[in-house]
Amino acid sequence: MQSERQKYIRNFSIVAHIDHGKSTLADRLIEATGTLTEREMDTQVLDNMDLEKERGITIKSQAVRLIYKRNTGEEYTLNLIDTPGHVDFNYEVSRSLAACEGAILVVDATQGIQAQTLANCYLALDNDLEIVPVINKIDLPSARPEEVKQEIEDVIGIEAEDAPLVSAKTGLNIKDALEAIVNKVPAPEGDEKAPLKALIFDSYYDSYKGVVCHIRVKEGTIKEGTEIKLMNTGKVYEVVEVGVFVPNYMPVDELKAGDVGYVTASIKNVRDARVGDTITEAKRSANEALSGYRPAVPMVFSGIYPVDGAKYEELKEALEKLQVNDAALSFEPETSIALGFGFRCGFLGLLHMDIIQERLEREFNLDIITTAPSVIYKITKTDGTLIELTNPTNMPSPSEIKLMEEPIVKSSIITPSDYVGAVMDLAQNRRGIFKDMQYLDTTRVSLNYEIPLNEIIYDFFDALKSRTRGYASFDYELIGYKDADLVKLDILLNADVVDALSMIVPRERAYAKGRNMAQKLKEIIPRQMFEIPIQAAVGAKIIARETIKAMRKDVLAKCYGGDISRKRKLLEKQKEGKKRMRQVGSVEVPQEAFMAVLKTEE
């Protein structure tokens, strides 16, 4: 059922490929509806982390309430929920979409449909949203709006004939976009008298208010003093404040079915208010939670260690603070012989990992060393137990392993047809299995591959961009596990295993990878006073070796002429000393060495 009030509400989000102008369009909508004065307008209002502005990406979902007056005098409340565009934050996007009834699909008029346009669009369709295509960047000379419209109709299969043609940069035709939202996005429904059901689509920690939950009320009413219960954790809290975003907080008396806003209830930790959870009243609970909740599952793991061992506690505090705001981040203490005490951290994907590392360095001024990222392998041992392996150092000996499985992703790559050969070559090199390909139009092709996650985890995206001159776009999702013949590759320096450099590789590639790493390390590790052998080993078998020659003083400099035995005595003495040093000497591994190991593909 729909109340009179709900008829004038529109909840929508904006989805797009990276850099197609989603956050800029959001800025223009905020400006056009007069939500912020020009003085308060800051480019990309909704991206409020420095890192988001710098990288030009949206990391956390944001929401803002716009009041739009039509020429007919009617006033509409538009709730815009800005979503992250990157594949790592797929779950956050899907929850933000579940809070809406419609989605604006922004497509760049110069580039047309890209891989993430499709991925996000399918997510929106999965949530039964009404999709409103908007074509952006029509002020550019290379814009081809008519072709792009045709493409949207052919590839996605939605009507795009009267799609608004806008330029978010110059503010051209923004009114058309607002009209399209009002006309096409359905108004919310839901009974205001029913038991409360509200979806948390984002939550973060504020040092004054505690955890602030961004919610979409689906049914019922929530106001200050209500006792609420989170359905997945079962915890009960009392509401301290409810309000709306303009983008800053503005407390209101109550939020009813159809509204988007925030609620604070002195919750101490984001983990207690998970994205996707359902809020209901403690006394008058809803029968079942809203569907679609799933705990965030990390896909990529990496070790993070302080460069200065004494900073361990500071690193722990920093990670805890980040975790308060980021429920997808997980970490547990681990020790490494080479690096001392640190943490094994789990991330949603590479971008997420990168962002966390950068925030640790930037917001907490920590110097950190990170080890090669790895994925979760499933190992069935000979005695039948199943273990999940996130750290290569913990891999059991080959005699105990019956079966080893690695995660596989389904990836779609959209590329100009000229580069199909290069892309296929790259995918095959990364153990990809070709599934199918389709032409989107005469110039662009979509290729679908199944590739082990381990192969794309580090530099697949960079390699793809460089082979296609930056034109290809890429999107992936995890589809399951598959058995694989994998071995653990160890690196020994001066006959000691450096545990932080161990990695899991396919058996047929172990030799090439080992040789490559040994050569790379030889270039990077500084020379010492004694000779250092660098060895790559699989099990007890050494498969590659390089030697860093010792620095030596010219002990014969003071012998002018003289007997050969005198010179020999001096050289023997030097050799003896170097031998002793090598027994007691230890090798410091510089941070660059860890990074270099990752980049051995080139």
UniProtKB/Swiss-Prot annotation:
HAMAP family: LepA. It is found in: Cell membrane. Its EC number is 3.6.5.n1. GO terms for molecular function: GTP binding; GTPase activity; ribosome binding; translation elongation factor activity. Keywords: Cell membrane, GTP-binding, Hydrolase, Membrane, Nucleotide-binding, Protein biosynthesis. It catalyses: GTP + H2O = GDP + phosphate + H(+). The lineage of its organism: Bacteria, Bacillati, Bacillota, Clostridia, Eubacteriales. Required for accurate and efficient protein synthesis under certain stress conditions. May act as a fidelity factor of the translation reaction, by catalyzing a one-codon backward translocation of tRNAs on improperly translocated ribosomes. Back-translocation proceeds from a post-translocation (POST) complex to a pre-translocation (PRE) complex, thus giving elongation factor G a second chance to translocate the tRNAs correctly. Binds to ribosomes in a GTP-dependent manner. GO terms for biological process: positive regulation of translation. It comes from Clostridium botulinum (strain Langeland / NCTC 10281 / Type F). This is Elongation factor 4.
